[in-house]
């Protein structure tokens, strides 16, 4: 999981989700997992 100041979709399968006030990206590709920090 990468922690970035700005998160964005990398591919078509990435999904942006708000969880506990944080924006996270989940994807079938584990390299695309991101969280806003």
Curated annotation (Swiss-Prot):
It comes from the Eukaryota. Keywords: Chloroplast, Plastid, Ribonucleoprotein, Ribosomal protein. The keyword Ribosomal protein applies. One of its GO terms (biological process) is translation. InterPro entries: Ribosomal_bL36, Ribosomal_bL36_sp. It is found in: Plastid, Chloroplast. Pfam families: Ribosomal_L36. GO terms for molecular function: structural constituent of ribosome. One of its GO terms (cellular component) is chloroplast. Belongs to the bacterial ribosomal protein bL36 family. This is Large ribosomal subunit protein bL36c.
């Amino acid at each position: 999981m990468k922690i970035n100041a700005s998160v964005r979709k990398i591919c078509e399968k990435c999904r942006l989700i708000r969880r506990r006030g944080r924006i996270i990206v989940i994807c079938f590709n584990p390299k695309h997992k991101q969280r806003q920090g």
